[in-house]
C-alpha cells in the first residue's frame, strides 16, 4: 500500500495542500462515511490501517509491504480494538493516531525537500490553524465553531444570508452571516470574544467560511456545514424540510 502514490509536493503550499487533502479524506471516514469505515475494520482481518489520500479519498488497507516504506505508515491494527471499546472512544483513538500520521507525512516531505526553519514554522502554523481530526470527531471543533461563529439562531438572520435565493423558508441552506452590531452590543463581552476568534467554521472539516460556497445548517445541533462535506447539493436542499447532520442522524439511529 502506497500512502499517496507518486505525488511528491515540494513547496510549503503544496505540502499543506497534500495535508488538507489527506485530512479531509480521513475526516470523511470517521464522520460522514463512518458506517462504511466501521464495516471495513473487521477485527477478524489482519493488521489494517486508515489511509488518507491527497485527493480527499480514504482507504482501509494493509500496511505497505516494502521496508522501509515510501512514506511514514499510519498506525497498525486499528481494526483489533473496534469491538473492544465504545464506538466513540474507538473513533477518537483512530483520530488521534491519524493526526500523528498526517504530521509525520507533512514533515517527512519538509525534511525530504530541505525546508528551512522559516518554511517549517510556516507549515506548522498553516497546519495548526485547522482543527485536528480528533477535535472534529470528538465534537470539540463543533463547539469551537459555535464559539467562533457569530451566526444567529433566529430565522430573521438566516433569511438575510439567503436573500439571494429569495425565500425565508430556505434560509437554513444559506451561507452563514455575522450578527448585526446592535446584537453584538447586547451580548457584551462574550460576543466580543467571538469576534476575535473568527468566522463560522464547518462542523465537519473545521474550515472557515469562504465566498461562493454552499452551506447548510443542521436543525438539531444548529451547526453549519459545507454542502460538499455532508453530500448535500443546493438542489437537494430545496426538498429537505428538516436537515439533520450525519452526527445527529447517527445519534438518533443508535438511541
Swiss-Prot record:
Ranges that cross the membrane: none
Residue list for modification N-acetylmethionine: 1
Gene Ontology BP term (one): chromatin organization
InterPro entries membership: Alfin, Alfin_N, PHD_AL_plant, Zinc_finger_PHD-type_CS, Znf_FYVE_PHD, Znf_PHD, Znf_PHD-finger, Znf_RING/FYVE/PHD
Residue intervals of every PHD-type zinc finger in the record: 199-251
Expression across tissues: Ubiquitously expressed.
A GO-annotated cellular component: nucleus
Localization per Swiss-Prot or TrEMBL: Nucleus
SMART domains given in the database record: PHD (SM00249)
Major localisation: nucleus
Chain positions of site Histone H3K4me3 binding: 209, 215, 219, 224
Residue ranges of the region described as Disordered: 145-200
Keyword Cell membrane (UniProt): no
Biased composition (Low complexity): 150-160
Domain remark text: The PHD-type zinc finger mediates the binding to H3K4me3.
Protein name: PHD finger protein ALFIN-LIKE 4
Organism, as annotated: Arabidopsis thaliana
Phylogenetic placement of the source organism: Eukaryota, Viridiplantae, Streptophyta, Embryophyta, Tracheophyta
UniProt gene name: AL4
Amino acid at each position: 500500500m502506497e500512502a499517496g502514490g507518486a505525488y511528491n509536493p515540494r513547496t510549503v503550499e503544496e505540502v499543506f495542500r497534500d495535508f488538507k487533502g489527506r485530512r479531509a479524506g480521513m475526516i470523511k471516514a470517521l464522520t460522514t462515511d463512518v458506517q462504511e469505515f466501521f464495516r471495513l475494520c473487521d477485527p477478524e482481518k489482519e493488521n489494517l490501517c486508515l489511509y488518507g489520500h491527497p485527493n480527499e479519498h480514504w482507504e482501509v488497507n494493509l500496511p505497505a509491504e516494502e521496508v522501509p516504506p515510501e512514506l511514514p505508515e499510519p498506525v497498525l491494527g486499528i481494526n483489533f480494538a473496534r469491538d473492544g471499546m465504545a464506538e466513540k472512544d474507538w473513533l477518537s483513538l483512530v483520530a488521534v493516531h491519524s493526526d500523528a500520521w498526517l504530521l509525520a507525512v507533512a514533515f517527512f516531505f519538509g525534511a525530504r525537500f530541505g525546508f528551512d526553519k522559516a518554511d517549517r514554522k510556516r507549515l506548522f502554523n498553516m497546519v495548526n490553524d485547522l482543527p485536528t481530526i480528533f477535535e472534529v470527531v470528538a465534537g470539540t471543533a463543533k463547539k469551537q465553531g459555535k464559539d467562533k461563529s457569530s451566526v444567529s439562531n433566529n430565522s430573521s438572520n438566516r433569511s438575510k444570508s439567503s436573500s439571494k435565493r429569495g425565500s425565508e423558508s430556505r434560509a437554513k441552506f444559506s451561507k452563514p452571516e455575522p450578527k448585526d452590531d446592535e446584537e453584538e452590543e447586547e451580548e457584551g463581552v462574550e460576543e466580543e470574544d467571538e469576534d476575535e476568534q473568527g468566522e463560522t467554521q464547518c462542523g465537519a472539516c473545521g474550515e472557515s467560511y469562504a465566498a461562493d460556497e454552499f452551506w447548510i445548517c443542521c436543525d438539531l445541533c444548529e451547526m453549519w456545514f459545507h454542502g460538499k462535506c455532508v453530500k448535500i447539493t443546493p438542489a437537494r436542499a430545496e426538498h429537505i424540510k428538516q436537515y439533520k447532520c450525519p452526527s445527529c442522524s447517527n445519534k438518533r439511529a443508535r438511541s
